[in-house]
Structures are given as C-alpha cells and as structure tokens.
C-alpha cells in the first residue's frame, strides 16, 4: 500500500493516513478505503455495497440537499430578523456540520490493544467504525463480538490465505461462511466483512 496520505475520492474532504487500501472508513461520507474499488470506480462487491461512482453520486446528492435546507433556514433567520442570509453563511454552516460530524467520530476513546495472538483492530475508533458499517449487518451484538469473530477468521486453519504483493498485508477468506479479513503488516485487523462478490473479491486481491 502507498504509505502517503490519501484524499478520500468520494467526498474529497477527508484525508486517510495512508492509502489506497487502508480500509479506514471516512468519517465524512462513510466510504471505506478499498483499493480495488479505488482503482475500479464502477466495481461492486467489496468493502462498500455501492461502487465508488455510486457513492460519489449519493454523497453529492445528500450534500446538495443539505445545502438547500441550510440556505432555506438561513433565509428564514434573515426574515425573522435573526441575521442576514447569504450563500457564504450557508456554506459556512454546511462545513461546520461536516466538521462536527467528523470530530464526533474521531473523539471516540482509544482502547488498549493487546499484543497476544488474538488479533484486534488498531484502536477503538477503527473497531467502532467497522462494527457500525459491517458488524451490525453481520448480526453481531457488540463491537467486541465482531472483533473476536474477525480474529477467529485469521486463526481458522481452513481459511484461504495470501499476502498482497504490493503492500504485504495478509488476506484471509473463509469460503463456507463468506468471511473476509485483512491484517496489516504489523498485525492489526484492517477490516472484516462479507463481500457481495464472495471468493471473486478475495481472488482479486
């Protein structure tokens, strides 16, 4: 993986610490940094249910709706004498909400990571974001339960395993349960989900 900082290709507002292929989830638009989808914007079946191009369209439509509402509210405030409405005010309000949403995500406290052979996410923030995106849909009742299951995939002797040639990350896949896990070169879980494309997604790594 490219270790340089990487601008989210969906919202173009958040910068991943590294990428593409970090599997970090953008706190602004919720796009997960999937290298295959970054390189093939129309590809479905990876870490994101929608293709990158579909995610971009969805984000832009939501942002446009929000800006329309913000302008409307600002206009009402101006009519009521609470202040003057302007396009710059609306844009400032929109950016403030996006910033607040980003900060609320990043202020989650960091948990202590264990150095045993039980694999974990790098910190609580990453665990929580992946649990919210994938774990609940997979039926797990808690983030810790989701993390424990991801670790079990890595240690499962029946799991398919390969090392990514470009970045050295370890990729694990259990075909019978359609479970996919990536572990970083320093031993932390990057992501865990059920790819819609199944083993075809694993084979593309």
For the regions a protein language model found, what residue spans apply to each?
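Short cysteine-rich clusters marking metal-coordination/redox-active sites
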Residues: 8-11, 26-29
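Short, intrinsically disordered terminal segments enriched in charged and Pro/Gly residues
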Residues: 40-65
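Bacterial Sec-type N-terminal signal peptides, specifically the leucine/valine-rich hydrophobic h-region
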Residues: 76-79
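Functional cores of ribonucleases/endoribonucleases
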Residues: 141-205
């Amino acid at each position: 993986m490219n270790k340089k900082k990487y601008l989210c290709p969906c919202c173009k507002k958040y910068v991943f610490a590294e990428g593409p292929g970090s599997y970090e989830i953008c706190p602004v638009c919720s796009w997960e940094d999937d290298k295959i989808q970054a390189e093939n914007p129309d590809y479905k079946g990876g870490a994101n249910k929608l293709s990158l191009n579909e995610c971009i369209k969805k984000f832009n439509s939501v942002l446009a709706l929000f800006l329309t509402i913000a302008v409307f509210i600002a206009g009402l405030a101006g009519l009521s004498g609470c202040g003057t409405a302007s396009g710059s005010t609306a844009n400032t309000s929109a950016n403030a909400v996006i910033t607040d949403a980003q900060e609320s995500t990043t202020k989650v406290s960091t948990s202590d990571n264990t150095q045993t052979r039980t694999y974990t996410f790098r910190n609580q923030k990453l665990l929580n974001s992946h649990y919210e995106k994938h774990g609940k849909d997979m039926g797990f009742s808690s983030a810790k339960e989701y993390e424990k299951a991801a670790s079990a995939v890595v240690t499962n002797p029946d799991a398919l395993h390969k090392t990514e040639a470009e970045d050295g990350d370890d990729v694990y896949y259990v075909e019978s349960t359609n479970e996919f896990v990536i572990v970083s070169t320093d031993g932390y879980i990057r992501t865990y989900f059920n790819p819609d494309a199944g083993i075809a997604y694993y084979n593309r790594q």
